């Protein structure tokens, strides 16, 4: 039985009329957010805007928090005067969604205990859809950085509320799902896999992002970059290293 599902490119109308009702019958609950452009559209047009969704088994988890991350808003708030950030990243309306779930005690087997000393085990599931165009490798990479940075903030706040003594980004399990629109040798995959990336990586296309990129590093705005933008998570891919024959079949 599938514990949770993460989907991208789900149309708003399809989420509310097809996916959510059908999955609720199978004991799932869900969270969905459309791309940012939906805010300025008519009700009829809004139905056809796609977004990201997360579904989870109600018998296994209780929803504690839910968050939508609009990349254009994060870009605007962290532009620091970068024209590239405003003209290339902020103009794309991709989004991500995150849920903080409490794991039901019944799921722990004999001898198993929550990671925290507190009697509550949380799990975070995050799902995002990055920009598609190969000519915008910089945008894909920065969107990924922004999302991971926002997830880190959500995780730290959830960790402090759950009674954890630290805000270690690895103190709560994280499942990160995404349509990265990126190949295995891309800066996006390098950043996620290696814990960081050089601030002069070729995927930035030599554009002037350096100052604002530090806003998304685990060192923070006042930290020392040492030429790298880092995220602090210990991520491991659920896929094999080999390139899949296809990721979309029509």
Give, region by region, the residue ranges found by the protein language model.
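Acidic, proline/serine/threonine- and glycine-rich low-complexity intrinsically disordered segments
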Residues: 3-7, 208-211
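Generic hydrophobic alpha-helical segments
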Residues: 1, 19, 99, 144-147, ...
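Structured beta-strand-rich core segments of catalytic domains in phosphoester-bond hydrolases
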Residues: 4-132, 228-232, 242
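Short, high-confidence coil segments that cap the C-terminus of an alpha-helix
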Residues: 2-3, 171
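Intrinsic structural disorder
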Residues: 1, 116-124, 156, 192, ...
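Metal-dependent phosphoesterases centered on the DNase I-like endonuclease/exonuclease/phosphatase
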Residues: 24-29, 135-250
């Amino acid at each position: 039985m599938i514990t949770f599902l993460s989907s991208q490119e789900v149309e708003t109308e399809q989420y509310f009329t097809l996916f959510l009702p059908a999955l609720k019958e199978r004991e799932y609950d869900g969270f969905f957010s459309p791309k940012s452009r939906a805010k300025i559209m008519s009700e009829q047009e809004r139905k056809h805007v796609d977004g990201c969704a997360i579904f989870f088994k109600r018998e296994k988890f209780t929803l504690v928090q839910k968050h939508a991350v609009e990349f254009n808003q994060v870009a605007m708030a962290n532009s620091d005067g970068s024209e590239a950030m405003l003209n290339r990243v902020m103009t794309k309306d991709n989004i991500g969604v995150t849920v903080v779930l409490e794991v039901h005690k019944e799921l722990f087997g004999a001898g198993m205990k929550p990671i925290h000393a507190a009697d509550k085990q949380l799990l975070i599931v995050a799902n995002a859809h990055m920009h598609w165009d190969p000519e915008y490798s910089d945008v894909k990479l920065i969107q990924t950085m922004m999302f991971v940075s926002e997830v880190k903030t959500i995780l730290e706040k959830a960790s402090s509320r759950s009674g954890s003594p630290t805000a270690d980004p690895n103190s709560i399990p994280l499942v990160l799902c995404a349509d990265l629109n990126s190949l295995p040798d891309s800066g996006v995959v390098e950043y996620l896999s290696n814990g960081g990336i050089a601030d002069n990586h070729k995927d930035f296309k030599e554009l002037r992002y350096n100052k604002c990129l530090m806003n998304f590093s685990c060192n923070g705005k006042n930290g020392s970059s040492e030429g790298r933008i880092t995220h602090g998570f210990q991520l491991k891919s659920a896929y094999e290293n080999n390139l899949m024959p296809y990721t979309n079949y029509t």
